[in-house]
């Protein structure tokens, strides 16, 4: 059998194939088979996307869980002669003069490990270890070749490792063990988002990709919101129970994922497993069963003649000029969006508004973006959507700074929400755009680097936000300028609207050359 990447899977169909005359006469590539069989979006496709997307729900819970487990607990005085809760410094009082509210010191990591008088660096060390683990894991896991395990197994292993480590956190006896386990959790889940996005995008047709990729993003936000409810119900319990309540369901989820989730048909095709790929398409689209049966009857079954496709990994981005240029530009844009997405909520304290209200509204404002993003993707091209969005977000950030200086707090806060809203829209747009720019063989690695740029941008946020302590709200101007300035690099990227996904680097190069020559999609 010839190279399965470029060779048409079926050159013609016989008269009894049940396919129309036009289809019988044209060469039928695997990409055409995927587009034809997944042209409709049924319940089973929605189920498969939601099943994989649930990994992001549990991922979100582990990202934000330290907001509750590592919180500084409230306390009250026992000896009012020497203790005044409104004026006393807890670290200057004898331990017998005060007590934690609820009478239990195990409600928080701070109280259980006696960190109430420790430095802010030590108290924040577990959270920092989590993000350091995410950065280290992102770079390390990006070195794994795309064809090593498969999309489904990568989602499964990352979620399972995160869940098991989260359960083991309850056995921590000191802050050092706890910090180490938080590092492992961050390392394990560092690429869960990337793995899930790639698996989902490769199991839908071009028509439905913009809407389908918004489902896991919505589940991510719901995971953050559900954590608040779980934490509220467990507020009188030890912080260890919160880890159990979020990680045990994730373990059961992994079992369902293993039993019911389907592998990416495009990845199976890249491995020469065409018959298995057709079986997956048949399960996902029962209405196209007759069409797919006609295809599978023509498949070559002798696997010994299959020529192994070349192995691709992150190094291919450096050996191909076009790939390196694209991934570099994508990372520049995502760095700017990452600074804004993670930094704007962090700097909200510089505006004279209720911090709890501002954080709640920042979370809620994300939900409409998952409805608006598909509309933008379907009606406008990718580059102009990203460009206009980042320019609007940048202008909103600068206006937030100016209005805050002028004392117009309420209007400034509205523009703060607008900046965060545009950052989230830009993130959603770039996620779909990036998937379409790279072939199946390196798509997972590209998504990892996309995610890493976002995380590195987020890691710079605390430093930028701290500037607001000296010049109030100036951080919003910096976030806005970064978003709009770096967002203009999108003009370098090729337009991908309406184009199907390629599988190999060679196929991507041929299509790009054809598009550049003919100027048509």
Swiss-Prot record:
Subcellular localization: Vacuole membrane
Name the record gives this protein: Organic cation/carnitine transporter 6
Binding site for ATP: 200-207
Family of this protein: Belongs to the major facilitator (TC 2.A.1) superfamily. Organic cation transporter (TC 2.A.1.19) family.
Listed Pfam families: Sugar_tr
Record topological domains on the Extracellular side: 59-123, 178-182, 235-241, 348-356, 407-412, 469-473
Protein's job: High affinity carnitine transporter involved in the active cellular uptake of carnitine. Also transports organic cations.
Main location group: membrane
Molecular-function annotations in GO: ATP binding; transmembrane transporter activity
Transmembrane segments: 38-58, 124-144, 155-177, 183-200, 214-234, 242-262, 327-347, 357-377, 386-406, 413-433, 448-468, 474-494
Glycan-bearing residues: 79
GO cellular component, one term: plant-type vacuole membrane
Tissues expressing this chain: Expressed in roots and stems. In the stem of secondary inflorescences, localized to the phloem. Also present in flowers, specifically in the stamen, in the filaments and the connective, and restricted to major veins in leaves.
Key word Transmembrane helix present: yes
Induction: During drought and salt stress treatments.
Cytoplasmic side: 1-37, 145-154, 201-213, 263-326, 378-385, 434-447, 495-521
UniProt entry keywords in alphabetical sequence: ATP-binding, Glycoprotein, Ion transport, Membrane, Nucleotide-binding, Transmembrane, Transmembrane helix, Transport, Vacuole
Biological-process GO terms, alphabetical: cellular response to salt stress; cellular response to water deprivation; monoatomic ion transport
Organism: Arabidopsis thaliana
Membrane topology: Multi-pass membrane protein
